[in-house]
Amino acid sequence: METIVNGISKTLQKNERKMGSEAPAISLEMLDGQTKVIGMLATKVQVMITLPFQNSLTPELSSIIEKYQDQAFIYLISAQTLGEMTNPACSSTDFAELAKKFGVYIDETLCAKSLFIINKDGQFVYKEITKDVEDAFDLEMFETKLDEAIHFKKKGHVHENWMGA
């Protein structure tokens, strides 16, 4: 897979992640100094947002993050500090390992612009990697998929349903 940086096509290095596949577990240092392990089974849906530049975080994306921050673990990962609109407990510049494992690594100074949604079972249910690092995300689709993932109810044998309770 490739992305465009300043008009030049760059090959994204390392792994390409497929929908339904298991997300890799990654330890990330957040800007507040905490280390968090992300990408595994979790009590909430997880969202990984990789942003290439300091100014990549738009007010529209920030609004979606704010709307869903209590219902999902939302992480912003970038090679550069993103500024005041971010929560240091959920933001990281420790991007290289995640970018490699998620297939969005460009080089030691840059990652592709991407969105990943991981369900509670630790599986990828949505991904978007922009064609150009300057392109906008499809935020309407992202919000729809995030809402679906948060409100997904597992089907199958549940004792209470089986007993008619």
Regions found by a protein language model. Give the residues of each.
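Chalcogenol-based redox active-site neighborhoods
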Residues: M1-A165
